[in-house]
């Protein structure tokens, strides 16, 4: 059942938590002479990411969006935006769209936005409500202002097929459906603005997220936009890689397998961390194993030489001003004269700056 306990039809173990039943099941098999083999096997197993308690996969009734019907439209719309780097669009995301399956958008939990579907007990009559106004008209309730489930689950819709009343299904939306609906929800479209106003800011000029969002936000944005508007939801997209712990595993607050960002900032400065990330595989949508020593080396190999060069410049400006009795002022004409200089060091400096350009 929903609590992980065996149902009454499993008479020998009814009401027992599935993990607590393991040793009893083994003993029952042994006592009945039906045990073929018993031992310990090491294998992957699902655990709750919060409580770390063992999980059991169980088939439940869910609601799906038939993504397979619009797969070709998804592939076509994927060709329009500009992706940086481009290989994510051409390989990873395209492959994900090519193998797209129907999307299970419902979740069996309490917290979440309620799916606005009312159905008869036999599921043969279904109504999907499109607005508060429509819900008021269908239910006859005029004081609907809050759409959280505790405020609408009691509302019923009279059946048009003689099936009594329709009740809201118990499921709520997958949070990724909500993320993919962001372009419309942020402006309360189509209720607060019309099509013309909406299209002034759609598709988005630019979005950015991590590589893992090819299966998350990028995907749900594209599916909903293709279904609702027939086009891609963005014009330009920048993808960054994933920053991992030093040992190559996912960063985890519970495992504390990464240095505190505030410690890094306080010890080495925010700019050192920024430059470390800017000069890493992350900007090429590749993974980075974050190392504190990497940030430290940026300070030692880049920022300290920069600071020493700056200090050398300031010291010589101060000496120049003291010797000449006037302020040092940048003179663009001096650059032109340096280009014609016969001094080898001057010519090297000009050459180095041209290489930078």
Where are these regions (language model features)?
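Short hydrophobic/aromatic-rich motifs at helix boundaries and adjacent loops
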Residues: 72-75, 193-195, 245-247, 329-333
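Alpha-helical recognition segments enriched in aromatics with Gly/Pro capping
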Residues: 1-4, 109-111, 119-121, 129-287
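Short, glycine/acidic-rich hinge or "gate" loops at secondary-structure transitions
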Residues: 113, 237, 314-336
């Amino acid at each position: 059942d929903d609590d992980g306990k065996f149902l009454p039809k499993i008479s020998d173990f009814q009401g027992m938590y599935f993990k607590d039943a393991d040793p009893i099941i083994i003993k029952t098999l042994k006592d009945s002479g039906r045990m073929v083999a018993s031992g310990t096997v090491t294998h992957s197993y699902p655990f709750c990411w919060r409580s770390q308690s063992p999980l059991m996969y169980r088939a439940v009734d869910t609601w799906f969006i038939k993504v397979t019907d619009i797969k070709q439209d998804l592939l076509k719309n994927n060709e329009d935006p500009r992706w940086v780097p481009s290989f994510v669009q051409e390989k990873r995301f395209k492959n994900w769209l090519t193998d797209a399956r129907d999307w299970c958008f419902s979740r069996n939990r309490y917290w979440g936005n309620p799916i606005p579907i009312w159905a008869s007990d036999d599921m043969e009559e279904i109504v999907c409500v499109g607005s508060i106004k429509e819900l008021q008209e269908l239910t006859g309730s005029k004081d609907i202002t809050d759409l959280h489930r505790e405020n609408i689950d009691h509302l019923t819709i009279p059946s048009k097929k003689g099936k009594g009343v329709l009740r809201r299904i118990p499921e709520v939306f997958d949070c990724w459906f909500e993320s993919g609906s962001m372009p419309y929800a942020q402006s309360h479209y189509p209720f607060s603005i019309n099509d013309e106003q909406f299209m002034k800011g759609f598709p988005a000029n630019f979005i950015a997220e991590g590589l893992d969002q090819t299966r998350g936000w990028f995907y749900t944005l594209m599916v909903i936009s293709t279904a609702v508007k027939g086009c891609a939801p963005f014009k330009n997209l920048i993808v960054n890689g994933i920053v991992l712990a030093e040992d190559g595993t996912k960063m985890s607050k519970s495992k504390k397998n990464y240095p505190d960002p505030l410690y890094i900032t306080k010890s080495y400065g925010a700019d050192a961390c920024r430059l470390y990330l800017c000069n890493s595989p992350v900007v090429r949508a590749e993974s980075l194993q974050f190392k504190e020593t990497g940030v430290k080396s940026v300070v030692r190999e880049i920022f300290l030489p920069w600071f020493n060069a700056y200090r050398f410049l300031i010291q010589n400006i101060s000496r120049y001003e003291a010797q000449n009795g006037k302020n040092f002022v940048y003179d663009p004409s001096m650059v032109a004269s340096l280009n014609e200089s016969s001094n080898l060091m001057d010519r090297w400096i000009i050459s180095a700056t041209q290489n930078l350009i």
